[in-house]
Structure formats: C-alpha cells, structure tokens
C-alpha cells in the first residue's frame, strides 16, 4: 500500500512536472508564434524595402544621368565661352596694334604738321622781309625819280653843266633800272613765296584733315576696345559662373554616387538579413 502511494505521488509529481513542462512549452510556442508573426511582418517589410530601394536606385540613376548630361552641357558651354574669350582677346590685341599704328601715324602727321607750320612761319617771315625790301626799293626808286627830276631841272637851268647832268642822269637811270629790276625780282620772289605759302596752307589743311581723321579713328578704336573689354568681362563672368556650376554639378554627382553606394550596401544588408531570417524560420 505504501508502495502504491509512493508510486501515485511519483506519478502525480510527474504529471505536475509534465503540466508545468506543457505550460512552458505552450508559452514557448506562443512566443515562437509571436516571433514568427513578427518575423513574417519584417519579411513583408523587407519584401517592400527592395522594391523601394530599387525605385530609389532607379531615381538616383536617372538623376545621375541628368546630372552627367547637364555636366556635359556645361562643359560644352565652358569650352565655347573659353573660345569666345580667346577670340575677344585676339580682337582686343588686333585693335590695340591698330591703335598703336594709328598713334604712330598721328605722331608722324603731327610732326609733319609742325614742320609745315614752321615752314609757313618762315615763308611768312620771308614775305614780310621781301615786302619791306620792296617798300625800301620803291622808296629808293621814288628818291631816284626825284633826283632825276631835279637833274632835269638843273639841266634846264644850267646848260653849261649839261655833261655833268647827263652823266648824273645816266647814273640815276642806271640806278633806277637796278631798283626796278630789284623790285621786279622782289615781286617775283613774293609771288613764288605766296604760291609756296598756298601750297603749305593746302598741306596744312590736308594734315589737319588727316589729323582729324586719325583722331576719329583713335576714338573709334578706343570705343571698340571699351566695348570689347566689357564683352570680355562678361564672357569671363559667364565662364566663371559655368565653372562654378560645373563644380556644383560634380559635387551633386559625387553625392548621388555616394548615396547610390549607401543604398547598395543597405540593400545587401537587407538581403543578408532576409536570408538569415529565412534560415531561422527553416530551423523551426
């Protein structure tokens, strides 16, 4: 009887242990079910994540292609701008060379103008000298004429002195002829100087016109240089802006590439996590 009681107690204890173990197993089963449900939810989320990652990857790839195209366009624009700047530099250099040549021609013209002015002043001075000489010769001729008149009067008053008077008259007539020749020579010289003065005046007018045209060309070259300088600065500003924009695009491309790499790493991590989860589920 005692043995039966012990056996029943042992069986009851075994039953209690079995019930406790069953409760524990049931609790473990519930935990396992909850874990399974959670894992299934995570699996569903993970299934959605690759699609989202793929969408993000596609969008990033499209953005990268667009950025590359914009970068190529900006590089072409930068190349064209650099060509335009080089062309403007060549034009400015050519205009500066033309300006230097024009300034040299202007300097030569001013030198010739100075020489012509000096020649005109010299010719005017000679004209005044010859006019003074001509006036002196005319005064001398008037004086000789008066002497001739006096000699004739003396000849009329004194017949006895006719030989002396004739000699004086001859001398006076010779002096008068010399004076007339000098007057004629002076008049001819004056006419020559007047013609020369006219030529010099025409040369001066021509040089003044040339100087005015040269000044106009210089002003035109200066205006062209000013305009080209403004265009050059604008082209340089556009080139600088294009270069900054290209750098900005390059940074954006680098950022997209980094983001793409991060997304790839994230996708690989998610794939590894999914594989591990499936392996754990298969173990259950």
UniProtKB/Swiss-Prot annotation:
GO terms for molecular function: protein homodimerization activity. Keywords: Allergen, Coiled coil, Muscle protein, Repeat. Residues 155-171 have a biased composition (Basic and acidic residues). It comes from the Eukaryota. Residues 155-187 are annotated as: Disordered. SUPFAM superfamilies: Tropomyosin. One of its GO terms (biological process) is regulation of muscle contraction. InterPro entries: Tropomyosin. Residues 1-273 form a coiled coil. The molecule is in a coiled coil structure that is formed by 2 polypeptide chains. The sequence exhibits a prominent seven-residues periodicity. Homodimer. Belongs to the tropomyosin family. Tropomyosin, in association with the troponin complex, plays a central role in the calcium dependent regulation of muscle contraction. This is Tropomyosin Lep s 1.0101. It comes from Lepisma saccharinum (Silverfish).
């Amino acid at each position: 009887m005692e043995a039966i009681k012990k056996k029943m107690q042992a069986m009851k204890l075994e039953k209690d242990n079995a019930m406790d173990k069953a409760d524990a197993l049931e609790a473990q089963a519930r935990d396992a079910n909850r874990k399974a449900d959670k894992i299934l939810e995570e699996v569903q989320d993970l299934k959605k994540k690759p699609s989202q990652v793929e969408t993000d990857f596609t969008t990033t790839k499209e953005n990268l292609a667009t950025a590359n195209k914009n970068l190529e366009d900006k590089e072409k624009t930068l190349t064209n701008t650099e060509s335009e700047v080089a062309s403007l530099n060549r034009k400015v250099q050519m205009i500066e060379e033309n300006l230097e040549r024009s300034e040299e021609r202007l300097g030569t013209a001013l030198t010739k103008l100075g020489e012509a002015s000096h020649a005109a002043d010299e010719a005017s001075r000679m004209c005044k000298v010859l006019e003074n000489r001509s006036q002196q010769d005319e005064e001398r001729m008037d004086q000789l004429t008066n002497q001739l008149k006096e000699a004739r009067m003396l000849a009329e008053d004194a017949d006895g002195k006719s030989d002396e008077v004739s000699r004086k008259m001859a001398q006076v007539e010779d002096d008068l002829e010399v004076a007339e020749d000098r007057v004629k020579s002076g008049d001819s010289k004056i006419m020559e100087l007047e013609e020369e003065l006219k030529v010099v005046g025409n040369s001066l007018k021509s040089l003044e016109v040339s100087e005015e045209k040269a000044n106009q060309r210089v002003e035109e070259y200066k205006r062209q240089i000013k305009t080209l300088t403004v265009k050059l600065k604008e082209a340089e500003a556009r080139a600088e802006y294009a270069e900054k924009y290209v750098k900005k695009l390059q940074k954006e491309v680098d950022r997209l590439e980094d983001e793409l790499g991060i997304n790839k790493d994230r996708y690989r991590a998610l794939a590894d996590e999914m594989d591990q989860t499936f392996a754990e589920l298969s173990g259950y």
